[in-house]
Amino acid sequence: MGEKQILDADDIRRAMTRIAHEIVERNAGVRDVALVGVRRRGVPLALRLAAALEEIEGVRVPVGILDITLYRDDLGIRGPAPVVHATDIPFDINGRTVVLVDDVLYTGRTVRAALDALTDFGRPARIQLAVLIDRGHRELPIRADFVGKNVPTSRDERIATRLHEVDGGVDGVFIVRVSESTTE
């Protein structure tokens, strides 16, 4: 299994800054905007976006954490005892523009689970999706509103995102070649 780096820490920072500007532009500011990071790597990306939005607009945007474990459609094949983490959305999402944040968009199934989980907390005015990487291969009709980088991949490749808040070390995004017997 080999890996090839496609984004380094500076590339990730620039992508997140650009996405923050796009969020401001699309929503005519950040009034009534909230960010919700999909656990695990969506959370630090949401916090980074919030910091960038505050720098651009001078307004602190609320950030929530969403665990989708029990909403996944592959729960039965992922193992007998899923580890469920806390969801923490300490603000009312009703009537807000909620930007879901995740690291990689692939089949769309994680986003579908996140939408199901999020709507259990209320009825946002709209939900937008921000991802660091869109790798294609959609199985559901889901499209990101904000994309850091489009990275076409083959089915025998996966994207590995490393963020210092979760993984330690230096930030980076890598394409990793995997064998056909390995599942993502």
Swiss-Prot record:
Transmembrane segments: none annotated. Its EC number is 2.4.2.9. CDD domains: PRTases_typeI (cd06223). It holds the Pfam family Pribosyltran. Disulfide bonds: none annotated. This is Bifunctional protein PyrR. It is an enzyme of class 2 (transferase). One of its GO terms (molecular function) is uracil phosphoribosyltransferase activity. Regulates the transcription of the pyrimidine nucleotide (pyr) operon in response to exogenous pyrimidines. It catalyses: UMP + diphosphate = 5-phospho-alpha-D-ribose 1-diphosphate + uracil. One of its GO terms (biological process) is regulation of DNA-templated transcription. InterPro entries: PRibTrfase_dom, PRTase-like, PyrR, PyrR_bifunctional.
